[in-house]
Amino acid sequence: MQEITIERTQHPKQKPTDQTRLGFGNYYTDHMFLMNYDEGKGWHDPRIVPYGPIELDPAAMCLHYGQEVFEGLKAYRTEDGRILLFRPDRNMARLNSSNERLCIPAIDEAFAVEAIKKLVSVDQDWIPTAEGTSLYIRPFIFATEAQVAFTRHRSCFLPSSFPRLAPIIRKGSTQ
């Protein structure tokens, strides 16, 4: 299994103090997981880095053909403070199922789960503790090859980021 390098942020963000007003996708953690794919090398260079913009060639296939897949899963705290992920193995299996449909190279599902666990560990202070809240994890993969003509993917990118999440349906709601 590949080693995941970690570069910790030198400028931590301020965490929201009112966990009842988090909303969906309004806050992002300090770090993100990245990994590249190149034909011949496979998936390589797994790393956790400070959250920030991703550079992308304007001719990247994901921009012209929508060659992108994503999954969503949650990390949450139990009453005794443990951190749990909700069925990450199934999420990674679904991600690979989507990859297959779009001819995106498969990921090692077990490695992807371990990478997410490591990222959750690095940013564990971002996991909200209020009832019904969680840390939403969004692994996604997109084709990065600069090619306007449609072809099989030779290069892809796997980032994962964490928007904080309040309950989507509030307790007592009729929706």
Predicted regions, residues:
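Conserved alpha/beta cores of soluble small-molecule-handling proteins
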Residues: 1-175
